[in-house]
């Protein structure tokens, strides 16, 4: 149970962590179910990064603050952070906690993430940094969830066409400026 708490703390709400501790098969055996997946990506990293010059520690700290800001709405909605990829994130709703309104929850979570970015911008602009934006792609469909990877390194993940579609939607945000 402690290993599960250590693995998922910070990636899932306490409610989700407790459910996984009570049902470890949800991790190891996996599941196939309808989920809502969201990819989010920071916009404006280059100007932000350049504003730090050689201060890598400062940039690392501000990026961690950004990730904290966009993660909290996910945890508040009982979603689960699947992974961080550079300045992007991927999270899922309706797994492992059932949410019959998960498409709506995912969209509301995305809006809450945008509000969190606005508050984050208030802070960094006051410090003389350029503001950033966030694009998001949300899709609902079938997902295959579970512990995946090699024996040397593995993590909880979600796979499926619905995941690829959410990623493509997020990439279109760049093209259409949303």
Placement of each model-derived feature along the sequence:
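Short, conserved clusters of charged catalytic residues that mark active-site
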Residues: 3, 65, 164
